[in-house]
């Protein structure tokens, strides 16, 4: 059963303002990348939590993201920085295409790894990896171009086992959070 959303009106306002800011960054990035066409920013593979939280949660305090490369344009990097600001009490992990395959090979049984290996589309591989990793490790998955609209410490509650987002009455997959559910 879904829990009521805390601060729902404030979250809606914040989301609108953040989208406006994001669009401004995108507009600015066009002339920026016209002047510096080869310049890319590096998203770190690991960034530890910046503050220690006293809040204990069932959901692991790790943000997971994946992309074909951690060398990104200004808008994607600005989005990463904004998400870090909204998740200061969480570790951050970026996983590349190659690292996704290595992780699944090291942590899955042969049947599961073979199923992953048959996927040829990068988006399908990322979908498989995100669900597999969340079940193994727990934590929060956010698409590389997705943004948090409110501090994650205010979204995930102490006893939440999973947090999913609905948009127009349908569940999305750009944000998924769950506790570790490794098979025993």
UniProtKB/Swiss-Prot annotation:
Gene Ontology cellular component terms for the protein in this record = membrane
The Swiss-Prot or TrEMBL record describes its family as follows: Belongs to the glycosyltransferase 32 family.
- Which EC numbers characterise this protein's activity in its record? 2.4.-.-
Q: Which GO terms describe its biological process?
A: mannosyl-inositol phosphorylceramide biosynthetic process
Q: Which GO terms describe its molecular function?
A: mannosyltransferase activity
Q: What Pfam families does this protein map onto?
A: Gly_transf_sug
Which keywords accompany this UniProt record? Answer: Glycosyltransferase, Transferase
Q: Which InterPro entries match?
A: Glycosyltransferase_domain (IPR051706), GlycoTrfase_DXD_sugar-bd_CS (IPR007577), Nucleotide-diphossugar_trans (IPR029044)
User: Which PANTHER family does the record cross-reference, listed alphabetically?
Assistant: INOSITOL PHOSPHOCERAMIDE MANNOSYLTRANSFERASE 1, MANNOSYL PHOSPHORYLINOSITOL CERAMIDE SYNTHASE
Q: Does the keyword Lyase apply?
A: no
Asked if the Swiss-Prot or TrEMBL record annotates the protein with the keyword Disulfide bond, the reply is no
Question: What is the name of this protein?
Answer: Uncharacterized glycosyltransferase in aroQ 3'region
